[in-house]
Structure formats: C-alpha cells, structure tokens
C-alpha cells in the first residue's frame, strides 16, 4: 500500500500502522525474567505508575533514592503496560548500563541501543575572525551504526521493543516512510529473478563484495545470494531455483553452519538515509532553486564559493547517489518546508509509546539546549557562503517539538527539577530500598578547622576498614587537601575532569581494594561512584551556594554514602543556607521513613559488598613485548577489543584498536 508523504509529526501519529510488515502485529509480548520479586517501595511504585498510565496521565515522576532499584521498577511497568518503550539517558555510559540491565530483564524481547555513532567528531565550522574554514571530520563506529539500524528495524517489525538512547535520538534521521518503502520482502515460493534481487539490494545501499562479508554487504555464488543486513551479525542465505525463491535460511557467519530455515525475511535498507531515484531528481531541482534565490543575497566571494560548492555536490549526487555533507540537504530530500522539524528516531515509534526519561534533572536541560548550539555553529557557514540556508534544517528537535511526542512519560530522578514537578500528575516516591539500607546520618559542622575535622573522621573510618570521599570546590583545593592528607600519613588520591574514563575506573577500583583510603574530588556526582565501601563523605565549604552546592547536588552527594549501613555525611558550613536546609530535611525525612519500615518488618540493614572486577590491563606500554610475541598479543588484544565492543565499552575498544594498529606496524617493520 502506498503511503503519501507526511510531515514527521503527522507520519508518527496517522500513518504508522501502514509502514509495518505483517510480523509487527504478530510479535510477542514483553516477558520480564528476574530472580527476585519487588520489595520495599517497589510494589506500590509499580502499582501507582501503571495506574497513572492506564488513566492516560501524560506525565508522572518516579522519585527514587539511590539504590532503590528504579530500573527494576521501570521494567515491571513496561512488562505490564506492553507498549514499545524509549528510554533516554543523558550520556553514553549511563545508556550502556541501562541497555545491559534491560537486556537481562527482557532476554526474549528486543532491547536496542541508539547513541551517536561517532568515535570522533569535529563538526564543520567557519571562524570569521581568522578566516578559517574547518571541514567536518568524523570517524564512524560500525558496531554502533549496526545497533542504530537494528533499533529502527525492530521498531518497524515488532511491538515488544525497548530502545535505550542518548539525546542523539532527537537528531535528524532518515525518513521512516522511505526506510520501510524501499525495503523488500523475500518469501519462499515467490517468483523473482536473481537480477531483480541484486538491483533492489544496490538501490538500498548494500554493497556487493564476494570476498569479505560484513553488515551492509552481499555476495553471489550461482543461484545463492548471501546477505548480511546492516542490523544483523549472521548471514541471510537466499537460494533460488530458476526464478523462484527455493529456500531462505540464517547461517552462522563464523562457522558457516545453517542455524534455521525461514519462510519469510524482510530486508531493510543498509543505511537510514535512502532516497528513491525519482525523489532524488526532485530534490536536486529544489536545491538548485534555493541556490538561485539565495545567491543574490551574498557578496561576490561568498556567492562564487557557494555556487561552486553546491553544483559540485549536485554532480556527485547524480553520479554516485551521495556527496560529502549530504545531510545538509536533507530538507529537500524529505520534502519539508523551511523551519519544519526533521525526522528522528521518535518518528519510528507508534503514537502510543512509553517514554522514560532517566536522570531527568540532567536529561531535560540537555534536550532543551541541543537546538541553539547547532544553530549558532551553522550561522557563520550560511552567512559566508559555505552552506545554503536549508542546512539549518538538518538539526536536532527544538524542545517544544520534542514535547509533542510526550504522551506517556515517566521522569526518573532522585532529585526532580521544577519542569518535572510542574508537569507531573503524580510524583511516585520510591524511598524504601529492597536491601533495607537507610540514608546516611547527616551533620552540619562549622567551617573553622574543617580540614582537621575531616582528617579525624577519616582516621575513624579507616580504622574500621571503610573508605571516605571528600568533595571540594576547586581543583587546586582538591590537590592541596590530597597533599595535606598524604603528609599526615593518610593514603589519598584526587579525581578531576582531566582523568580519562579508563583511568577513573581504575582509581575507583583501587579505592575499593584499599590501595588508598580517601578519594578527593570536585564533582562526585558522576556515574560509577556508588561504592559500598564508602562509610564517610565530607563536603567542604557546603554553604557556598552555586554549582554542586545547591540542594539537588547536595542530596545526590549524600546519596553516595547510602550503600553502607554505617555511613555518615558531614557538611562544613557557617551559614545554614536554604540549599543545606532542604538537603538535610529531605535526607532526614527519607531516613525516618526507612528506619520505621525496617523496624516494622524486622529488617536489619547490611552493607552489600559488590564483587570487585579484575584490573583493566595496562595497554599503553608496548616496549616490553618481545617481537616474536607480538602476533600472539595482537590476537589476544583483538579478542579483548571485540569483548569490549560487545559490552558497549567503546572507549576501551577504540584504545585497543589503536594499539593493535601500532603493533601491526611494528611487525611490518621487522
């Protein structure tokens, strides 16, 4: 059935059901698999959130304390509501953690991962003051590109789909109408010529390569066509008998063994940006019309530059179907009006989907800010003749455009901001932890002598075998405090923003192992610092209002001590600021509720000791490796690189890949 072109919003809300193949309506339901039952505040939180969704309440907030099992609560809600779900996190690391957790909860359903696919990205820009043009430079991670394609293919073919995404989900993506229309189905018994299948594959940006198969490629041997879709790991083998599809099967890429036969397979495009040939010609005409209209508004130099560049791009598109920076012409290919919102991942969802915004106090501001940053960068490119004005429309959504998709929303945060509180029909608290652990005891002490007092508290903590965190206002203070503690025979290290993720992970591991006892830092709110060994947190200069000393930040920092049953937090301040008062009062309120619940149910909280993972091998020094051992080391590193990519630790995988390249050069030099 042909679907007429729609704007992104109209397409999502009116025509979605026409864009799906038959499997979509027969796909399985969500099935939550877990070895434990909801406990603490989880049962009532699940019940209230489900009730709110069934009553069609547009916004709800899950206010859950650290360690209360918010992800498990959300998984239970998804399991009961049974709608395709988008979970948005504010960074890749958190998105990867959530993706892995949801995969464990829903092993029989489709859990997908959608983040930016750039390992490295330098956007195109122009600096008028220096007359310096900076060309776009990017390195795409093929594994993440494959996972992005898998997310959209799953949304087109199934209902039991959870997509965990970063804010990349509001950036421009190919038209879902084209993505579906240009795909094609293969059925056993269909009458189709081999040439027709090959032409269709080429049309949707598959590459023929009879030597090396990888996602987005196909090979041909006689009447057998092997395809690896862009969102697949294994081979789809299509065997023809004359002009008839005789057999379709999934074949293990590594072993060549047939895994299963299938009656039907739908081949989606190998890229998100696919354009039918007739639309391509129409788009080129539209681009040239815009060029003619815009040239008179520019100076002589800018006009010449833009005309030369645009005509070259059009020639490339006509010859090859693409050009460098083709995304800047996306408005023309999508037949959108100037200023009209682009298609994005949200347009691949049905109208009635569930939206979870994790750590909403950080994610909502990110969603707000994306459009303005993109617009300001492109202004000089347009003003100085490097891009047509239509480049503005290759952009992320404005926040008000994003809000149109917010029909069934759950904000998740320990410290919701004003936006969440003002919009939510209900705020569901999850205060009681399944483990019985309570929020730490909080004290406020004078600033005078704060360093000496912190040192005394640290000594007590170290004597009982626990660790301490101390947060300062500046990097210089963190360094000075670390040196002071070291002079007083206390093993301390400091953490700051210059330290890379891998080093940071190793520092936290060494803290847990007891190689040092105190971690000093400025921003201790980042993920990965929920350490059960931490029995004391000292917050220096707590009455200096501002970043990291507002009530939300203080509550978050206090929560870092909530995984230890004997923990304590001390805020050093001479003035009881409004932020301190709110943080202390809220912590005491939660603590009282938790203690009362434990007494009523006879629960004695115990610190849960998480296993400490193995050390990340130091891979920066290769000088000690004997030349004869390098080939074996490369094999081991390659295996480790693939494992890192599988667990979505792409920073580690990139580091390993670069080391492998370095070692391969050494082998060639021998």
Curated annotation (Swiss-Prot):
Record-linked InterPro entries: Helicase/UvrB_N, Helicase_ATP-bd, Helicase_C-like, P-loop_NTPase, UVR_dom, UVR_dom_sf, UvrB, UvrB_inter
Which residues does the UniProt record annotate as the domain Helicase ATP-binding?
51-433
* Swiss-Prot/TrEMBL keywords: ATP-binding, Cytoplasm, DNA damage, DNA excision, DNA repair, Excision nuclease, Nucleotide-binding, SOS response
Please quote what the entry notes about the protein's domains. The beta-hairpin motif is involved in DNA binding.
Q: Which GO terms describe its cellular component?
A: cytoplasm; excinuclease repair complex
Q: What does this protein do?
A: The UvrABC repair system catalyzes the recognition and processing of DNA lesions. A damage recognition complex composed of 2 UvrA and 2 UvrB subunits scans DNA for abnormalities. Upon binding of the UvrA(2)B(2) complex to a putative damaged site, the DNA wraps around one UvrB monomer. DNA wrap is dependent on ATP binding by UvrB and probably causes local melting of the DNA helix, facilitating insertion of UvrB beta-hairpin between the DNA strands. Then UvrB probes one DNA strand for the presence of a lesion.
Where is this protein localized, as stated in its record? Cytoplasm
The Helicase C-terminal domain, residue ranges: 453-612
**Which molecular-function annotation in GO is an example for this chain?**
ATP hydrolysis activity
- GO biological process assignments: nucleotide-excision repair, DNA damage recognition; SOS response
Q: Which domain of life is it from?
A: Archaea
Q: What's the protein called, per UniProt?
A: UvrABC system protein B
Describe the location of the UVR domain by residue ranges. 631-666
Q: What taxonomic ancestry is recorded?
A: Archaea, Methanobacteriati, Methanobacteriota, Stenosarchaea group, Methanomicrobia
In this chain, ATP is annotated as bound at 64-71
Q: Where is this motif: Beta-hairpin?
A: 117-140
Where is the signal peptide, in residue numbers? none
Q: How does it assemble?
A: Forms a heterotetramer with UvrA during the search for lesions. Interacts with UvrC in an incision complex.
In the record, the note on similarity to other proteins reads: Belongs to the UvrB family.
């Amino acid at each position: 059935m042909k679907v007429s072109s729609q704007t992104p919003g109209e397409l999502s809300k009116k025509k979605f059901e026409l864009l799906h193949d038959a499997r979509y309506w027969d796909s399985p339901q969500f099935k939550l698999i877990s070895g434990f039952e909801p406990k603490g505040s989880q049962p009532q939180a699940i019940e209230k959130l489900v009730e709110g969704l069934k009553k069609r309440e547009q916004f709800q907030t899950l206010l859950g304390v650290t360690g209360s099992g918010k992800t498990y609560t959300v998984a239970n809600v998804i399991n009961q509501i049974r709608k395709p779900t988008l979970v948005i996190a504010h960074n890749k690391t958190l998105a990867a953690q959530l993706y892995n957790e949801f995969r464990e909860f829903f092993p029989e359903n489709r859990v997908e991962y959608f983040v930016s696919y750039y390992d490295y990205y330098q956007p195109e820009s122009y600096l008028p003051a220096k007359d310096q043009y900076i060309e776009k430079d990017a390195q795409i991670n093929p594994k993440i590109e494959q996972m992005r394609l898998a997310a959209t293919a799953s949304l087109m073919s199934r209902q039991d789909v959870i997509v965990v995404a970063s804010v990349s989900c509001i950036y421009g993506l190919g038209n879902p109408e084209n993505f579906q229309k240009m795909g094609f189905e293969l059925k056993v018994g269909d009458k189709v010529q081999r040439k027709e299948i090959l032409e269709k594959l080429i049309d949707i940006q598959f590459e023929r390569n009879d030597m090396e198969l990888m996602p987005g490629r196909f090979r041909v041997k006689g009447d057998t066509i092997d395809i690896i879709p862009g969102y697949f790991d294994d081979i789809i083998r299509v065997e023809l008998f004359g002009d008839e599809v005789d057999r379709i099967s999934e074949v293990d890429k590594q072993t060549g063994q047939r895994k299963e036969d299938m009656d039907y397979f739908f081949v989606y495009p190998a890229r998100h940006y696919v354009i039918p040939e007739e639309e391509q010609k129409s788009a080129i005409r539209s681009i040239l019309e815009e060029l003619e209209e815009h040239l008179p508004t520019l100076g002589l130099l800018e006009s010449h530059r833009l005309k030369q560049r645009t005509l070259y791009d059009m020639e490339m598109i006509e010859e090859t179907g693409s050009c460098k920076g083709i995304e800047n012409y996306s408005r023309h290919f999508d037949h959108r009006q100037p200023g009209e919102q682009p298609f994005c991942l949200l347009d691949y969802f049905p109208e009635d989907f569930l939206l979870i915004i994790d750590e909403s106090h950080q994610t909502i501001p990110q969603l707000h800010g994306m459009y303005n940053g993109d617009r300001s960068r492109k202004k000089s490119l347009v003003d100085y003749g490097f891009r047509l004005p239509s480049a503005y429309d290759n952009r992320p959504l404005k926040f008000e455009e994003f809000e149109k998709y917010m029909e069934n929303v759950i904000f998740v945060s320990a410290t919701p901001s004003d936006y969440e509180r003002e919009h939510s029909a209900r705020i569901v608290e999850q205060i009681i932890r399944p483990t019985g652990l309570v929020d730490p005891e909080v004290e406020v002490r004078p600033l005078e002598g704060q360093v000496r007092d912190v040192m005394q508290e640290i000594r007590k903590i170290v004597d009982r075998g626990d660790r301490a965190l101390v947060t300062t206002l500046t990097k210089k203070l963190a360094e000075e405090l670390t040196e002071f503690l070291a002079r007083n025979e206390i093993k301390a290290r400091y953490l700051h923003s210059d330290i890379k993720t891998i080093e940071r992970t190793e520092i936290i591991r060494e803290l847990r192992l007891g190689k040092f006892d105190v971690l000093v830092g400025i921003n201790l709110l980042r993920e990965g610092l929920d350490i059960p060994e931490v029995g004391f947190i000292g917050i220096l200069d707590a009455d200096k209002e501002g970043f990291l000393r507002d009530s939300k930040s203080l509550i978050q920092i206090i929560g870092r001590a909530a995984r230890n049953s004997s923990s304590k937090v001390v805020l050093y301040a001479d003035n009881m600021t409004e932020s301190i008062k709110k943080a202390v009062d809220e912590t005491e309120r939660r603590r009282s509720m938790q203690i009362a619940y434990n007494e009523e149910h006879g629960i004695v909280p115990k610190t849960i000791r998480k296993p400490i993972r193995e050390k990340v091998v130091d891979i920066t020094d290769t000088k000690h490796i004997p030349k004869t051992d390098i080939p074996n080391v490369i094999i081991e590193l390659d295996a480790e690189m693939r494992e890192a990519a599988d667990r979505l630790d792409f920073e580690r995988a990139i580091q390993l890949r670069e080391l492998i390249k370095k070692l391969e050069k050494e082998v060639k030099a021998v």
